[in-house]
């Protein structure tokens, strides 16, 4: 399966985001799936 946008993810895990990439989100202090274009 894949992780939906804004789902919590781990860059070191084998999971992949449905759309976008797994990146650090400062205001949540977590890694989350975000769209590459920066417009979620």
From Swiss-Prot:
Keyword check for Secreted, yes or no: yes
**How is expression of this protein distributed across tissues?**
Expressed by the venom gland.
Coiled-coil annotated residue ranges, if any: none
Q: How is it modified after translation?
A: Contains 3 disulfide bonds.
Q: Which UniProt keywords apply?
A: Disulfide bond, Ion channel impairing toxin, Knottin, Neurotoxin, Secreted, Toxin, Voltage-gated sodium channel impairing toxin
Q: List the disulfide bonds.
A: 2-18, 9-22, 17-33
**What would be one Gene Ontology cellular-component term for the protein?**
extracellular region
A GO term, aspect molecular function = toxin activity
Cellular compartment(s): Secreted
- Which family does the similarity line name? Belongs to the neurotoxin 19 (CSTX) family.
- Domain comment, as recorded: The presence of a 'disulfide through disulfide knot' structurally defines this protein as a knottin.
What further note is attached to this protein's record?
Answer: Negative results: does not inhibit the sodium channel Nav1.8/SCN10A.
Role:
Blocks the Nav1.2/SCN2A, Nav1.4/SCN4A, Nav1.5/SCN5A and Nav1.6/SCN8A sodium channels. Shows a slight preference for the Nav1.2 and Nav1.4 channels. Reduces the peak amplitude of the sodium current and negatively shifts the steady-state inactivation process. Does not shift the threshold potential of activation or the voltage corresponding to maximal current. Does not change the reversal potential of the sodium current. May act on site 1 of the receptor.
Name of the protein in question: Mu-thomitoxin-Hme1b
Tell me what organism the protein belongs to. Heriaeus mellotteei
């Amino acid at each position: 399966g894949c992780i939906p946008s804004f789902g919590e993810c781990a860059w070191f895990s084998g999971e992949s985001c449905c759309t976008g990439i797994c990146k650090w989100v400062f205001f949540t202090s977590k890694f989350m799936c975000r769209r590459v274009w920066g417009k979620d």
